[in-house]
Amino acid sequence: MQLNPSEISELIKRRIENFEAVAEARNQGTIVSVGDGICRIHGLADAMQGEMLEFPNDTFGMALNLERDSVGAVILGDYEHLSEGDTVKCTGRILEVPVGESLLGRVVDALGNPVDAKGEIKAEGSSPVEKVAPGVISRQSVDQPVQTGLKAVDAMVPIGRGQRELIIGDRQTGKTAVAIDAIINQKNSGIKCIYVAIGQKASSIASVVEKLKEHDALDHTIVVAASASESAAMQYLAAYAGCAMGEYFRDRGEDALIVYDDLTKQAWAYRQVSLLLRRPPGREAYPGDVFYLHSRLLERAARINAEEVEKLTNGEVKGKTGSLTALPIIETQAGDVSAFVPTNVISITDGQIYLETDLFNSGIRPAINAGLSVSRVGGSAQTKLIKKLGGGIRLALAQYRELAAFAQFASDLDEATRKQLERGQRVMELMKQPQYTPMTVAEMGISLYAADAGYLDDVEVNKVVDFQAALLDYLRSEEKGLLDELNSTPDYNDEVVGKMKKAVEAFKSSRTW
């Protein structure tokens, strides 16, 4: 076979003409060490703080420590298959999670992946987990209420839309119960809810989801679960992921409520990650930025004005304000509210609901200590009816607690003191409320009116709860018009007082309790 030089040169020319040299610029490095969910990488020159890093086998991580010679990263998920020498690539993206209406009714992990076996989620979009909180000019003052359905909360420590109200107490004092009742009560209020479970037992999370389903509350709720079996990085990120999901509704002129259960465990997870990354420890071995950890999260809960909503939606939504209300939970050790994390979160939030073990064990549930609990901005958001009647209730409880301390030592009490003590006992009984039984504004208002106007004074202390239950049954059957009127316009005036007085007196004359 004879070779033709011209054919060969022609073939080479054709190949050269058709050759496409594609140069791909890629920023990649090599794993130096890996263990405990932490990874050190050499060679990632242009990594950003909080950037997503791509590891082999579809595993992702997040850059947290940017040092001169290496990058410290947390691995999100399983890391057993990673080893020294593996290649790591920069993605050029900050960590994002899916957001939107399609997440309602679902249980997801800290990265927004479904964990409830109901199939994939077709999200409307995605949002960065870390966002800057709205500025002062973008905000609007808190003046609309979030009704929790709990008498003790709505009357004494009211919560407004866009507020941050801390729920603090020892373990087993009913902190989660207060938050879950608040979520259940939003069924017809239009408020979307996000429940973030951090570092809890998987069985506890399953039980909460079951209760929400049972009371038809799961349809308006997103559950973000980072159980105790998940890595510290996932527990640290879960709160920010839930917040991003809540901001989606806030920025569209809607109202959302987010529960962080609980931020103590998130601080523990962040402490673990920081110590493994060899950051210098401070008080209680927490890193120096543990205050910023919680402040940047809770400052994102806010009420934003209509101009800001219009700007964020490119003019699609006009004349509507949006809000994200936060209920962070903190667990104290033996009632010590002066520990590092509790004092931090108390100073960041707009008030706290303090739950006490002694009250809980004595059967007063929710176990709210009215003296130590406070709401700094919620008063301006209360309905007129509850605001007027709730003031008298709070005063009666405060006087009762003060006098009860003296009454232990005094043998003979004057008539006025004895009356105040007796009324205080009845108000304490009235504040008791079983779990999963939220009350409407009208039911709450009439119950508080009965106590405030002295209709409970001749009822035996152990019959107060029965009296209230019978009163509400009577109102639902005989005075439905009054309940509907108070629910639609909860004002406080002479006409309303007259109607409530007539209804309560009619019930008392029937003696059906």
Curated annotation (Swiss-Prot):
EC number(s) on file: 7.1.2.2
Superkingdom of source: Bacteria
Function: Produces ATP from ADP in the presence of a proton gradient across the membrane. The alpha chain is a regulatory subunit.
Subcellular location, principal: membrane
Subunit-structure text: F-type ATPases have 2 components, CF(1) - the catalytic core - and CF(0) - the membrane proton channel. CF(1) has five subunits: alpha(3), beta(3), gamma(1), delta(1), epsilon(1). CF(0) has three main subunits: a(1), b(2) and c(9-12). The alpha and beta chains form an alternating ring which encloses part of the gamma chain. CF(1) is attached to CF(0) by a central stalk formed by the gamma and epsilon chains, while a peripheral stalk is formed by the delta and b chains.
Family that this chain belongs to: Belongs to the ATPase alpha/beta chains family.
Protein name according to UniProt: ATP synthase subunit alpha
Enzyme class, UniProt record, top EC level: translocase
The entry's keywords: ATP synthesis, ATP-binding, Cell inner membrane, Cell membrane, CF(1), Hydrogen ion transport, Ion transport, Membrane, Nucleotide-binding, Translocase, Transport
The species this protein was found in: Alkalilimnicola ehrlichii (strain ATCC BAA-1101 / DSM 17681 / MLHE-1)
Protein's membrane topology: Peripheral membrane protein
Residues reported in the UniProt entry to bind ATP: 169-176
Cellular component annotations (GO), alphabetically ordered: plasma membrane; proton-transporting ATP synthase complex
GO terms of molecular function: ADP binding; ATP binding; proton-transporting ATP synthase activity, rotational mechanism
Cellular localization per UniProt: Cell inner membrane
Reaction it catalyzes: ATP + H2O + 4 H(+)(in) = ADP + phosphate + 5 H(+)(out)
Site feature Required for activity, where: 373
